Amino acid sequence: MSGIPHDHYEPKTGIEKWLHDRLPIVGLVYDTIMIPTPKNLNWWWIWGIVLAFTLVLQIVTGIVLAIDYTPHVDLAFASVEHIMRDVNGGWAMRYIHANGASLFFLAVYIHIFRGLYYGSYKAPREITWIVGMVIYLLMMGTAFMGYVLPWGQMSFWGATVITGLFGAIPGIGPSIQAWLLGGPAVDNATLNRFFSLHYLLPFVIAALVAIHIWAFHTTGNNNPTGVEVRRTSKADAEKDTLPFWPYFVIKDLFALALVLLGFFAVVAYMPNYLGHPDNYIQANPLSTPAHIVPEWYFLPFYAILRAFAADVWVVILVDGLTFGIVDAKFFGVIAMFGAIAVMALAPWLDTSKVRSGAYRPKFRMWFWFLVLDFVVLTWVGAMPTEYPYDWISLIASTYWFAYFLVILPLLGATEKPEPIPASIEEDFNSHYGNPAE
């Protein structure tokens, strides 16, 4: 897709021209912050800057914490307590880092569901969407390994349970599990590997974020109407857009300030609200916690993992058809990763010609059921695997897959969308009036 017509950077002084011919960094920054942006973006589009800020915050606080952290099973727990008690500002760094992970996932879930509602995954933005899903997977891996580092009870047993999932893969599973752990069980080699990867992966995420931004700068931003910016001429493009600076930067910074106000209130007044008290007990391989619960942002997919127990008919059927190769444990692993994979396949599963859910009445109903379903999965993921939570998680998991694999494809063929505006300018003027009037 050709870019949106707009003014590009033109060096004016001799020094600017000299630098631009050799390293056009000024031009790159100019074209990035002055990019034409659909003028009708609403407040759901502010979470991108929250994610960018939080990523930088996590990297900076993580580097500071790593200075005093010791990745050894005999010293890790004590080194975290040393950071909390003896290092100047150490408690603040740890609480900001721990709660920053929650803010990061909250923002990314809102970002994902906004994309699902407004059709930001549809052509020509498939690459942007897929790169975003890869970033999300790396976030999950990074957060999981980071949760292991304090070496509390939940850290140790969470690592034991999650790494055990790889052992469920037929044939090669035990070898993969041993390779991940560095031995037969979670121990010092595991902690060292997780610390190393936890330090590395945020920089990989940052690189993918740059690609993500590059991708949507190439195709142009989506917007609440799903209508593309007119590219026929610069004059038409200017009627549909505003430069990112200063209009959207100021708006985003204002929203970021409000989000950070709430974030630092949590850090200051209830920093352990989203944590688990068992993680303030040093890891003990001989004492299993009564109820192993991951961090809240893993709960929806943890619920899907546990939903398909051995007595569920589809698990029994698949187990029989595969002669026991795909048992209940492996089926749960497939379901958990499949729940993420179907989101990545949304560009091809959604057959509607209309992008935005704002003009799709039936889609809106099913979408809000999906949001409710996600909340229910988060809730049951924290509950024990007993009646009625097991049945609720199974029903909620079934709807998750049904939405992407059945409902989205059928809606494209059966739904009659509402009329969409001819241009972004028309939509903007219908809400805010014509500036020329």
Curated annotation (Swiss-Prot):
<dbReference type="InterPro" id="IPR048260">
    <property type="entry name" value="Cytochrome_b_C_euk/bac"/>
</dbReference>
<keyword id="KW-0249">Electron transport</keyword>
<dbReference type="InterPro" id="IPR048259">
    <property type="entry name" value="Cytochrome_b_N_euk/bac"/>
</dbReference>
<keyword id="KW-1003">Cell membrane</keyword>
<dbReference type="Pfam" id="PF00033">
    <property type="entry name" value="Cytochrome_B"/>
</dbReference>
<comment type="function">
    <text>Component of the ubiquinol-cytochrome c reductase complex (complex III or cytochrome b-c1 complex), which is a respiratory chain that generates an electrochemical potential coupled to ATP synthesis.</text>
</comment>
<feature type="binding site" description="axial binding residue">
    <location>
        <position position="97"/>
    </location>
    <ligand>
        <name>heme b b562</name>
    </ligand>
</feature>
<keyword id="KW-0679">Respiratory chain</keyword>
<dbReference type="InterPro" id="IPR030689">
    <property type="entry name" value="Cytochrome_b"/>
</dbReference>
<feature type="transmembrane region" description="Helical">
    <location>
        <begin position="298"/>
        <end position="318"/>
    </location>
</feature>
<dbReference type="GO" id="GO:0045275">
    <property type="term" value="C:respiratory chain complex III"/>
</dbReference>
<dbReference type="GO" id="GO:0005886">
    <property type="term" value="C:plasma membrane"/>
</dbReference>
<feature type="transmembrane region" description="Helical">
    <location>
        <begin position="248"/>
        <end position="268"/>
    </location>
</feature>
<feature type="transmembrane region" description="Helical">
    <location>
        <begin position="391"/>
        <end position="411"/>
    </location>
</feature>
<feature type="transmembrane region" description="Helical">
    <location>
        <begin position="330"/>
        <end position="350"/>
    </location>
</feature>
<keyword id="KW-1133">Transmembrane helix</keyword>
<dbReference type="GO" id="GO:0008121">
    <property type="term" value="F:ubiquinol-cytochrome-c reductase activity"/>
</dbReference>
<feature type="transmembrane region" description="Helical">
    <location>
        <begin position="365"/>
        <end position="385"/>
    </location>
</feature>
<dbReference type="GO" id="GO:0022904">
    <property type="term" value="P:respiratory electron transport chain"/>
</dbReference>
<keyword id="KW-0479">Metal-binding</keyword>
<feature type="transmembrane region" description="Helical">
    <location>
        <begin position="194"/>
        <end position="214"/>
    </location>
</feature>
<keyword id="KW-0349">Heme</keyword>
<feature type="binding site" description="axial binding residue">
    <location>
        <position position="212"/>
    </location>
    <ligand>
        <name>heme b b566</name>
    </ligand>
</feature>
<keyword id="KW-0408">Iron</keyword>
<comment type="subunit">
    <text>The main subunits of complex b-c1 are: cytochrome b, cytochrome c1 and the Rieske protein.</text>
</comment>
<feature type="transmembrane region" description="Helical">
    <location>
        <begin position="45"/>
        <end position="65"/>
    </location>
</feature>
<feature type="transmembrane region" description="Helical">
    <location>
        <begin position="156"/>
        <end position="176"/>
    </location>
</feature>
<keyword id="KW-0812">Transmembrane</keyword>
<dbReference type="InterPro" id="IPR036150">
    <property type="entry name" value="Cyt_b/b6_C_sf"/>
</dbReference>
<dbReference type="GO" id="GO:0046872">
    <property type="term" value="F:metal ion binding"/>
</dbReference>
<feature type="binding site" description="axial binding residue">
    <location>
        <position position="198"/>
    </location>
    <ligand>
        <name>heme b b562</name>
    </ligand>
</feature>
<dbReference type="InterPro" id="IPR027387">
    <property type="entry name" value="Cytb/b6-like_sf"/>
</dbReference>
<keyword id="KW-0472">Membrane</keyword>
<dbReference type="InterPro" id="IPR005797">
    <property type="entry name" value="Cyt_b/b6_N"/>
</dbReference>
<dbReference type="InterPro" id="IPR005798">
    <property type="entry name" value="Cyt_b/b6_C"/>
</dbReference>
<feature type="binding site" description="axial binding residue">
    <location>
        <position position="111"/>
    </location>
    <ligand>
        <name>heme b b566</name>
    </ligand>
</feature>
<dbReference type="Pfam" id="PF00032">
    <property type="entry name" value="Cytochrom_B_C"/>
</dbReference>
<comment type="similarity">
    <text>Belongs to the cytochrome b family.</text>
</comment>
<keyword id="KW-0813">Transport</keyword>
<dbReference type="InterPro" id="IPR016174">
    <property type="entry name" value="Di-haem_cyt_TM"/>
</dbReference>
<feature type="transmembrane region" description="Helical">
    <location>
        <begin position="129"/>
        <end position="149"/>
    </location>
</feature>
<feature type="transmembrane region" description="Helical">
    <location>
        <begin position="100"/>
        <end position="120"/>
    </location>
</feature>
